[in-house]
A protein has these predicted regions:
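Acidic/His- and Gly-rich active-site-bordering loop/insert found
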Residues: 2-89
Length: 89
């Protein structure tokens, strides 16, 4: 992925961000977490990632592994880790 070729449309970026922040996904609600994973998986795939869904436990929300093609096969890459559930007290 050549980041210099990405079209940064501020309105499109805000629309995409709005979908993410509007998706309530409490940790204890598997279906809600998976709805958030659906949004993330779709957006990552649209950016060129290969996306794999992983179900770690039948009562827990899925995990996503997204891989972007590296221009130099075998070279070191970058690992980004995060979570997509919303934490409630």
């Amino acid at each position: 992925m050549d980041v210099t070729k990405i079209d940064f449309d501020a309105n499109a970026m805000l629309d995409g961000l709005q979908r993410w922040v509007s998706c309530e996904s409490p940790s204890y609600d598997r279906e809600a977490v998976n709805r958030m994973q659906d949004i993330a998986a779709h957006d990552l795939a649209m950016m060129g990632a290969s996306v794999e869904r992983i179900t770690p436990h039948p009562r827990a929300g899925d995990c996503i592994r997204a891989r972007f093609p590296h221009p130099k096969a075998g070279a070191s890459g970058i690992l980004i880790i995060g979570h997509m559930d919303t934490v409630h007290p």
